[in-house]
Design a protein with these regions (language model features):
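Conserved beta-strand elements of the Class I
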Residues: 15, 350-352, 510
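Local beta-strand N-terminus motif with an aromatic residue
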Residues: 348-349, 452
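The conserved beta1-alpha1 loop
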Residues: 354-356, 513
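Peripheral, non-catalytic segments that deliver or gate enzyme domains
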Residues: 1-346, 358-376, 403, 417-420
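Conserved beta-strand scaffold positions in the cores of enzyme catalytic domains, especially
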Residues: 36, 325, 380-382, 541-543
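A fold-wide structural signal in alpha/beta-hydrolase
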Residues: 350, 374-384, 540
Length: 577
């Protein structure tokens, strides 16, 4: 895995995160290609790396045991050797990585130090001694979007799908996008002639908007055949590097708003572009792409359009073919897209893989557990049930609150479609999902138990009430907007929780969880396992002491995925319906 590229100030190196050692840590590779080398050998994962715009240093974020309580540190890349110097040290506080000030010496980030429920914007001075001051506060979740001399662009989340864009200039804060209803801002950045945003006011999918200096009225600049999700202005011109989500695949554009010229880079690997970093002279950019087989880094020359691979896995033990996009009609005639991953030979069986979120999307990027199962001979089907993103705001809201179980019904209809296609048999379909996808797994086997022969729940929700009560306080408000409020919807939330209907579960269930999960606490796994064991059901629990919301350590992944494959193979050998 190699991702999150950050080009150094001199353009001579690209810093990135790699799990080559078995744990995500900072690495570097020569800017024009060469041998990659580690920068630090810590014992905890590094979540991000941002190269200084002026000198040989970077800011990294580190947590402990997967708890997501990120601490910031300065990584010295000078000639005397590489060393790490902590900048924050409160393990109870989350420090969300942000952006360097353009002149260097200052780093802007978000933190919930004042109140664990909310994130304020802070400025950290890297002089000695290190000093931090608050730039923006309020009872909301704020995130750093972009930084320019004397200006700061901040996103304020009302919900995960309703974002206020704030322009901060000294003591003055301007709400750039006042709007009725809901507007999702996928990305934003300072351009040469204003602020550019990927947003969806009065439309289904996000397009390119511009806010001229001194104005809070947007101009709609460009619409794409998909959803705009990334904006990176050139450091030397008016051009914008853009990434568009087209039915899950990323399409990279170099668009100049001043002329309307739009170049599409069609060559190179196909997948999901997850991050981009310009070289300082604007001649090239480094990008991380997630595709079947791994996360890789490439350098693309702007003039020639040619790409060069910088880092990432050269090959995989059991290569997996790219998935095919298909769709079926649900009972109410809603079109449900899904990806089909074919095994290399005759299928051992069919598995349904449910993504998390729910405001997310199954895409043809790197999915290590899914690809492991495909490599083991399973046909894997990854649906985008109603409520998924990437298909417009109407589709995304089809599972809100009281509509929640309609998305579970989509899994039933998908199973029937697979049976109709003779790709599965009733009672012999496996179902796997993580996080919210784990909730969907538990809901599917408790609502339609006759369809599923085996299930794997990874860091999933068993009870929406206890989940909302125990999830990190910074998450509850945003999660209630999607699921329903404990104050007004408690009875309903309990009524649709899988734990409430656990007496209907007959499907053998493997539950995998991290002890330090701050999003979906371990209690969710423990209560469904305890309840099912008390009823004499076939259930097992695998807990990792040094993991959080998902598995990041390679040795843990190997244990978990091999265990899951063995569980599925054994339980799907004969039908349980």
């Amino acid at each position: 895995m190699a991702h999150l590229p950050s080009v150094t100030a001199d353009g001579e190196s690209v810093l990135f995160i790699s799990d080559e050692s078995g744990l995500p840590l900072p690495w570097a590779v020569p800017g024009r290609g060469g041998t990659a080398s580690p920068l630090w050998s810590g014992s905890e994962r590094v979540g991000s790396i941002h190269a200084s715009p002026t000198g040989p240093e970077a800011i990294i974020s580190v947590d402990a045991g997967g708890n997501e309580h990120w601490q910031l540190a300065r990584l010295d890349l000078g000639e005397r050797g590489k060393s790490v110097h902590p900048l924050t040290s409160d393990p109870q506080v989350i420090h969300v990585p942000g952006k360097w000030a353009k002149e260097g010496g200052r780093y802007i980030y978000a933190s919930n130090a004042r109140d664990r429920r909310f994130f304020d914007i802070h400025e950290l001075s890297l002089g000695a001694p290190h000093a931090s001051r608050v730039l923006l506060t309020g009872d909301a979740t704020h995130d750093v979007v972009d930084v320019a001399p004397g200006r700061l662009l901040v996103a304020r989340a009302n919900t995960n799908l309703d974002i206020d864009l704030l322009l901060v200039e000294g003591d003055r804060t301007v709400h750039l996008n006042p709007h009725p209803g809901e507007v999702t801002v996928q990305a934003a950045a300072f351009g040469v002639d204003g602020v550019y945003a990927a947003a969806n006011p009065d439309r289904e999918l996000a397009g390119l908007l511009r806010y001229r200096p001194g104005s809070t009225r947007h101009e709609f600049v460009r619409e794409f055949a998909g959803e705009l999700e990334l904006i990176r202005p050139s450091p030397v011109s008016s051009s914008l590097l853009l990434s568009v989500n087209r039915q899950g695949w990323s399409e990279v554009h170099l668009f100049d708003p001043s002329t309307g010229e739009d170049r599409v880079f069609n060559s190179g690997p196909k997948g999901v572009v997850e991050s981009v970093s310009w070289y300082p002279d604007g001649s090239a950019f480094a990008y991380g792409i997630s595709s079947v087989g791994g996360l890789q880094l490439y350098r693309r020359d702007v003039q020639t359009g040619k790409e060069k691979r910088l880092a990432g896995p050269a090959s995989t033990p059991k290569p997996v073919s790219p998935p095919m996009i298909r769709q079926f009609l649900a009972e109410d005639r809603v079109a449900i897209p899904y990806w089909e991953y074919p095994p290399g030979g005759p299928a051992r069986g069919t598995l349904v893989w449910v993504h998390g979120g729910p405001e997310s999307q199954a895409r043809p990027g790197f999915a290590p557990a899914l690809e492991f199962l495909v490599g083991e001979g399973w046909r894997v089907i990854a649906p985008n049930v109603r409520g998924s993103t990437g298909y417009g705001r109407t589709f995304t809201h089809l599972d809100d609150v009281r509509l929640r179980m309609n998305s579970v019904r989509d899994l039933r209809d998908l199973a029937h479609e697979l049976i109709r296609q003779k790709k599965a048999e009733p009672g012999r379909i496996g179902i796997v999902g993580g996080s919210y996808g784990g909730f969907m797994v538990l809901s599917a086997i408790s609502t339609y138990p006759d369809l599923w022969g085996a299930a794997v729940d990874i860091v999933g929700i068993a009870n929406l009430v206890t989940f909302l009560e125990r999830t990190g306080p910074w998450r509850r408000r945003l999660r209630e907007a999607e699921y329903g409020s404990l104050d007004t919807d408690r009875e309903f939330l309990a009524s649709i929780s899988p734990l409430t209907h656990s007496d209907a579960i007959e499907t053998p269930l493997l539950v995998i969880h991290g002890k330090n999960d701050p999003r979906v606490p371990l209690h969710e796994a423990e209560q469904i396992v305890t309840t099912l064991k008390g009823r004499g059901r076939k259930v097992d629990l695998l807990v990792f002491e040094d993991e959080g919301h998902g598995l990041v350590r390679r040795e843990n992944r190997v244990i978990a995925w091999e265990r899951a494959s063995e569980w599925l193979e054994r339980e799907l050998a004969t039908p349980h319906a």
